Each structure stands twice: as structure tokens, then as C-alpha cells.
Amino acid sequence: MTRPMTQALTPADRALTWAQQAALVVGASMFVAVCARVTLPLPFTPVPLTMQNFGVLLVGLMLGRRRGFAALALYLAEGLTGMPVFSPTGPGGLAQLLGPTGGYLIAYPYVAALAGWIMERGPRTFFRAARAAVLAEILLFASGISWLVVFTHSFAQALRFGFYWFIFAEIIKVMLAAGITTGWRGVRKV
């Protein structure tokens, strides 16, 4: 016998109505779409530097695994239908999901879910949020680099195109997402 959906939710989730839950998911997918617009194309790699990863991390850390996954699955569905939610440097739609950055995009729901799952498992401290974001980034880059290997036929080339140039920026995104998450949770307690 399966449990009702309301029993599977955390106490904080049950406090929100279904309309509020849906609004959070839709709002989070829109937030990631806005983050995708903040893009810096790099001439030496097909992977642009964007704030998308930051948005994905923040959504996962703030909304938890279920809503984080739902928000990023919705984001991908929006992109597949042709809505301009992906980075403007790519072709958009299915072509963007099948292009060089597809491995990163496809991982987004799982990245948000992993970050959210870790945050749900203990005290909501900066260290936990940063650790959750780092582990989620490892999943993100493992997926993105694996996908790039298909295009470059070289693991070393995939690392050059999709990892090395982004390390410093990703550290900043992790710290920013962790800081906002724990700061916001502190403000909400007051």
C-alpha cells in the first residue's frame, strides 16, 4: 500500500498549499531562465560561462530535492518547447539539449535534487550548504564532461572545454549559493 502524497512531504512542505508549491516550482524555473541570460561566451570553448549553475544550486538548496527537481525538469521542458530559457549563446530547443552543453542541462534536475537532499538531511549551516553545492557541482561536471567527450572524442579536450576554465567561477557560485541559502534561512527565523 502506498502512502498518500501528503505523508511523503516534509512538515514544511505540508504547510504550503499545492498552489504555493506550484508557484515556487514555476518561479524557480523562471529564476534559472533569468540566470541563463547572464552569459559570457568564451572564444576557446563551446561552453559559455553563465549564472545558470548558480541558479540551479540555489534552487536545490532553497527548495529541497522534490521541488528543486520539479523546477529544473520544468525548466528543461520549457526549453524543449522552444521557450528562450537556455543560454542565448546556443541554438535553443532540442538542438541545445543535444549540443555540447546538453550534458550539463540534462543533469540540472538531478543536481538540484542532490543539493536539496543533502540540505534536508541535517542542520542548515553554511558548511552543509557549501558541501551540498560542491557535491552537486561534481555531479554536474561529471555529466557535462562525459557529454563533451562524445563531441571531442578526447577526455583531455573535454576537460579543457568544459572544466578547467570554470573552476574559479564555480567556487564563487558555490560560496554565493551557500551564503544566500543560510543567510535567507537565518532571516526567515527572525
Model-flagged regions — what are they?
Residues T39-L114:
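Alpha-helical membrane segments and adjacent membrane-interface helices in multi-pass membrane proteins
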Residues T2-D13, Q20, V34, G92-A142:
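Short helix-perturbing small/polar motifs within transmembrane alpha-helices
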Residues A22-G27, F54-L58, G68-A73, T101, ...:
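Hydrophobic alpha-helical transmembrane segments
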Residues F31, C35, T39, V59, ...:
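Alpha-helical membrane-inserting segments
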